[in-house]
């Protein structure tokens, strides 16, 4: 029969805290805190590359063997993204919101067809990079940092809790993790500013993170070998993540709707979720 995991044993890391909490505290220190956080973003990029390297096995019979994405797999991913997006659009359309938010949501919803098309195009475009097992629920709260040494470690590899085990195990583009972490930096800067810190650029943190990841992953089978493919996947998966966030915030945290909504508005204005 098929084997399974009964229990796992994890290392205890004394004195550690989540990188989310640590980063919020850093940003309260204004300029110095942001400079330190830029350095940390580079470390997160390096760590993420190491994580993805650890999640592959060159043995073709292994459950962690990389696979070449096929057209049916890409189309299935695109269909799942578009179906999910349509559910979010329906939820947002029916939500009871303040008049200013209602107006912004309606403006965004008037472009939902073009957003759906962009999702499909990004994921079904020609891909040279292999699909692998990924973290699946990757954000700043999933990284522990020991403040004294600045050592960082990834935790919680269970994947998205609302998905089935088979879905969590499904191999996909590493840009699922990269987009999720990139969006986490946007949330971080929003929350820091809301609690009194200066306005900081999430896009700069994302660029530093991605540049460090590129250095650590250059030549890896899961990393695209051309800029066009990299940007298409980044935009596609960030768009998918922002849509997920919008649905979540409409349901559970209306005070946070502005974060994903601003990202989607930015995309409609410039074709990118990152500020230029």
Named regions from a protein language model:
Residues 88-133:
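An alpha-helical support segment within catalytic cores of ATP-dependent transferases
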Residues 137:
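Conserved catalytic-loop position in the HRD/HxD motif
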Residues 1-91, 148-209, 214-220, 226-227:
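Conserved ATP-binding subdomain of kinase catalytic cores across diverse folds
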Residues 199-200, 204-222, 232-276:
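ATP/Mg2+ or Mg2+-diphosphate-binding catalytic cores
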Residues 78-85, 108-116, 206, 264:
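Short amphipathic alpha-helical coiled-coil/interface segments
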Residues 64-82, 105, 224-238, 263-267, ...:
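Charge-rich, acidic-biased intrinsically disordered regions
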């Amino acid at each position: 029969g098929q084997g399974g995991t009964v229990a796992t044993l994890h290392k205890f890391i004394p004195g550690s805290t989540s990188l989310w909490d640590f980063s919020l505290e850093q940003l309260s220190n204004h300029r110095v805190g942001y400079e330190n956080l830029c350095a940390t973003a580079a470390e997160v990029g390096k760590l993420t590359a190491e994580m993805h390297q650890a999640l592959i096995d060159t043995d073709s019979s292994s459950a962690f063997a990389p696979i070449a994405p096929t057209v049916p797999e890409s189309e299935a991913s695109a269909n799942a993204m578009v179906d999910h997006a349509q559910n979010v659009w329906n939820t947002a359309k029916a939500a009871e919101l303040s008049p200013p938010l209602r107006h912004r949501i309606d403006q965004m919803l008037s472009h939902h067809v073009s957003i759906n098309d962009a999702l499909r195009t990004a994921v079904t475009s020609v891909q040279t990079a292999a699909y692998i097992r990924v973290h699946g629920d990757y954000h700043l709260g999933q990284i522990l940092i020991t403040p004294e040494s600045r050592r960082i470690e990834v935790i919680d590899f269970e994947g998205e809790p609302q998905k089935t085990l088979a879905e969590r195990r499904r191999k996909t583009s590493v840009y699922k993790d990269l987009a999720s972490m990139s969006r986490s930096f946007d949330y971080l800067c929003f929350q820091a500013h809301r609690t009194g810190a200066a306005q900081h650029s999430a896009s700069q943190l994302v660029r530093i993170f991605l540049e460090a990841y590129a250095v650590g992953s250059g030549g890896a089978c899961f990393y695209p070998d051309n800029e066009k493919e990299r940007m298409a996947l980044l935009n596609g998966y960030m768009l998918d993540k922002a849509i997920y966030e919008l649905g979540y915030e409409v349901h559970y945290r209306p005070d946070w709707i502005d974060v994903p909504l601003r990202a989607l508005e930015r995309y409609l204005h410039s074709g990118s979720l990152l500020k230029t």
